[in-house]
Every structure is written in C-alpha cells, then in structure tokens.
C-alpha cells in the first residue's frame, strides 16, 4: 500500500501519529500500543523513515518512540506498507515493513503553517447522569514547513518545526468532603477525606519542610516539540546525495507506579496495630484504587527524546546503479519528578487496607 502526502493530510488523526496512516492498508489492525499487520503483534513490524529505524527500542509502550509520534505528519512525502516483503535488506523482523520518505525542497518555494487545538471544553461533564471531574486540559499544536532552492537545480532544503502546548489533567479523583460521603469506583470521590489529606500535607510541610503538592483539581504542563531538516544535493548527473536530521522531545506525566502493592506483592497478609489480620490486594486497595489518593509529588515525568540522522548517496556507474546509506538513531528516556526529592511513603489505615 502506497500513501501520498495528499492522502496523509486528509486523514483525521487526533494523535498525529504515523500509526493512524498505517491503518489504511487492508491487512492492518489497531492495538492499544500501536499498529499491527497480518494478524501479528505490534512488535512484529519494522518502521523506517528515509531508511533509518524508527522503532521503540525500549521494549514497552508504543511501537514507535517518542510517545508514538516521532515525526510530524506534515514532514512526510509518502509512506509505503509492505505486508509480504521479499527484499533481503528488510530483515530482522517478522511482520510488515513500513517506510516513510520525508519531503524535500525543489526549484519552487513551498511553505505552510498549521494549527490544531482541543481542550476540556470539548469534553462532557456527566457520565450516566453522574458528575465527573473535568480538570483543565489543553492540546494546542502549531507548526510550519518551508522548502526551496539554495542553488537552483543543484542544492535544495526542507525544514519543519512543530511545538505542542500540552496541559494534561492530574488525578481525576477527589477526596471526600466528609466521612459520610459516598465513595467508590462508580463515583468520582475516593475514600480519603479532605481533612485527612490536608492534615497530612500540613504535617509533611511543618515537620520535614516538604510540600507534597496538590491532590485534586490540578493540571500539569507537558510540552513537546519536533524539528526536521533535510538537504538534497545534485552533485552531478551521476551522483545525488540527501541528508536528513530529525529530533523529537516529548514530556509525559504519569501516576505513581501500581506494579507493586505498598507493603508487598499482589496479595499480602498484613497485621493491623490491634492484631487484626488484613488481606491487602494492590488492585482493590493500591495507590490508584478508589480506596486511595496520592499527592501531586508522587507523580513522575517521563521524557522521551528521539534523534535520527540519515544520509543516502545514489550513484550511476556505467550501466550499474548503487545506493549507499548510513543511518543513526538514538532514543533516551530519563525520568524526573515534581518538587524536591523525598522517599516514597505509603500510609495504610486499618479500615482503608481492606477497602472498607
């Protein structure tokens, strides 16, 4: 399946990801982690841009690096999805081969400016008749492209830049205003009360000088940007060289880890101060369950940096054609936190541990 730039621009895509474009091939399917083809998994296929690998080397999360959107769709000239590849150069994977080619400059000048916007105003405030927390959120993407000649008929350039002002909601749950208020997974209120959360925050601030942050009704800024530059050089009638550089930086906010229960494994036998045995389950009474509530400082940020460089020399020697390609990709995903360093502390109340 071959997809042109015009088709790419006509596809409705909220995430502005290559995965949305890949779904145009009949054998494709969509998973929670990205594109799959021919009944395989999302890890089975290989994605390249100008011949450089654009796969998520980290091993978890999306099939593509940088949160699933490592390159702007406005920088792509065309894409191809090969379900049954036979080229020996396409090896090291079992699924389909997806390759995108970036735009290049020409003797004519071309430029574009684009803007995409969505916010919490586009969401409803009720589910099944119940009010839900509608915290401030924003996703505002602005970008531009420009391409043209540096030396006519000889040297051309293309540049794309994109910036996203992204504000994401924090915890969607709120504390109960009183101990008699209803709580649970079917309402927005969790078990802890406002008085309990405020009391603990005051204790941490006065005793240790540590501010754990907010626990409800807050949002976090997670901006990201993409840049791409490409040069095309017609060296002579027999040799053509193109070099492409791209870099993407995303910044995502995550809830505290729920892979472990606060005091042990999946099911842990605890003993309350009065000697009562308690069965603790991280799914029903863990850090993200309805029986708990966490402060803003318990969240963590996951930065996702992806850099790619590709250079290709096409030569004609007599009746023979030769292509030499060199690519380099680098993926870096450091973690950072809100506020100052402080140990992770889980506070387990006796009536809270059992989820009652």
Name each model feature, range by range.
Residues 37, 47, 81, 100, ...:
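Membrane-embedded beta-strands that build the outer-membrane beta-barrel scaffold
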Residues 10, 67, 86, 120-124, 130-134, 166-171, 216-217, 252-256, ...:
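Outer-membrane beta-barrel proteins
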Residues 119-136, 205-210:
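Substrate-binding clefts and substrate-entry loops adjacent to catalytic sites
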Residues 3-4, 60-63, 80-82, 126-130, ...:
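Extracytoplasmic loops and strand-loop junctions of Gram-negative outer membrane beta-barrel proteins
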